[in-house]
């Protein structure tokens, strides 16, 4: 593992070199009722989940580069980041939802490896991703915590462990004590402090804090938050309101997304929440329509930030495109080439990996990608194309803008 001082110095030097390239300036995204606006015109947030932009556990880097063998984590190569941004542009996407741009804790390579300690070197890949996203005109939606721990790790169990609760996802997912994450004053204060450290970090490429940079259009409480019973949506309204106020105080121009796993009716009246969401495994058109009806009644917006499936895909897209409440959606999840090797693609173990342009893709997979692109262009740009429209070629390496 490299000394943190060397990593931080290398990141600073790269940022100085990039400073000669003017940063793109995107307009903020605002909300009026159930409509998102950019410069007064309706805007839709369509794109993929690309969780690994800040930290990844799928690639072993070259010898000598930062790597944690316990969690198999490393920082993604800059070329991988620009490659996936160019891919999102080719897909017609307008945004990316990326977990590790906001969830980075409890791991030796993370922003907060231990309580209260900030690892500045971990911001290097995050800074680059945010900067390049702005240059590519791709906005970002960023969750702040995860209901699960994962391999990296990154979940609420990290804060529980730091506060002295010996709880693990494997053994304690149904233990009522996990609700301490939402109710324990010490944990809530620690999480609020963590949020502040993320949002007030200044990106050397843009000279803006994450709170200021309009490339990040929304922060989300977290990913698939719930309580000890699967599907209970037991993410207390008081906690959601508290986190929303923290984000709005630090970043008043950001939209705030309720990341509860499902649309919780008790949250609909929270003034600071702009957007509600749900995840759909498998794709469920009846559930989708019920969620849209709930959110419409509250005069808020809805985004489907996580969905994957094959059945009813076209019907699912059709409902969202016709809805006056749906402001976007994202599929799980996009991986690209393993730069600097343009001839190989990065794999992930969950069975939902989508690789644009992989020669090994089946005809079925490529047609699914075509349907996603058709949907993104229709919903995000109002452009209609044929379901079998040729997929644009993404050059490799994609340029750093």
Per-region residue spans from a language model:
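Cleaved targeting-peptide boundary
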Residues: 19-27
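Fungal secretory targeting signals
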Residues: 1-20
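Catalytic domains of carbohydrate-active enzymes that cleave complex glycans
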Residues: 372-401
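Short linear/disordered segments characteristic of secreted peptide precursors
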Residues: 8, 361, 376-379
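Active-site mouth of glycoside hydrolases
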Residues: 26-275, 279-289, 293, 297-301, ...
């Amino acid at each position: 593992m490299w000394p943190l001082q060397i990593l931080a110095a290398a990141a600073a030097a790269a940022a100085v070199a990039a400073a000669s390239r003017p940063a793109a300036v995107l307009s903020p995204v605002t909300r009026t009722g159930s409509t998102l606006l950019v410069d007064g015109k309706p805007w839709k947030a369509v794109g993929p989940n690309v969780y690994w932009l800040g930290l990844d556990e799928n690639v072993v880097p070259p010898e000598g580069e930062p790597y944690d063998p316990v969690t198999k984590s490393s920082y993604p190569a800059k070329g991988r980041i620009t490659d996936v941004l160019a891919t999102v542009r080719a897909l017609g996407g307008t945004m990316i939802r990326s977990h590790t741009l906001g969830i980075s804790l409890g791991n030796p390579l993370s922003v907060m490896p231990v309580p209260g300690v900030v690892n500045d070197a971990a911001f290097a890949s995050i800074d680059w991703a945010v900067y390049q996203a702005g240059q590519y005109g791709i906005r970002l939606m960023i969750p702040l915590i995860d209901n699960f721990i994962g391999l990296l790790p990154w979940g609420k169990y990290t804060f529980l462990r730091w506060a002295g609760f010996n709880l693990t996802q494997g053994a304690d997912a149904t233990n009522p004590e996990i609700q301490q994450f939402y109710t324990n004053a010490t944990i809530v204060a620690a999480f609020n402090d963590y949020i502040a450290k993320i949002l007030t970090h200044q990106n050397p490429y843009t000279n803006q804090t994450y709170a200021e940079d309009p490339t990040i259009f929304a922060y989300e409480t977290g990913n698939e938050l719930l309580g000890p019973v699967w599907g209970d949506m037991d993410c207390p309204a008081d906690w959601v309101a508290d986190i929303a106020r923290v984000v709005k105080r630090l970043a008043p121009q950001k939209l705030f997304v309720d990341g509860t796993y499902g649309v919780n009716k008790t949250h609909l009246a929270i003034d600071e929440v702009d957007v509600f969401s749900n995840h759909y495994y498998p794709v469920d058109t009846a559930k989708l329509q019920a969620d849209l009806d709930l959110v419409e009644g509250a005069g808020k917006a809805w985004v489907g930030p996580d969905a994957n499936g094959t059945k009813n895909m076209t019907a699912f897209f059709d409902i969202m495109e016709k809805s006056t409440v749906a402001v976007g959606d994202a599929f799980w999840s996009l991986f690209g080439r393993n730069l600097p090797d343009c001839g190989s693609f990065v794999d992930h173990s969950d069975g939902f990996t989508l690789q644009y342009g992989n020669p090994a893709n089946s005809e079925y997979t490529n047609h699914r990608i075509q349907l996603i692109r058709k949907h993104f262009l229709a919903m995000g740009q109002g452009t209609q194309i044929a379901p079998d429209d040729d997929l644009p070629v993404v050059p490799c390496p994609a340029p750093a803008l």
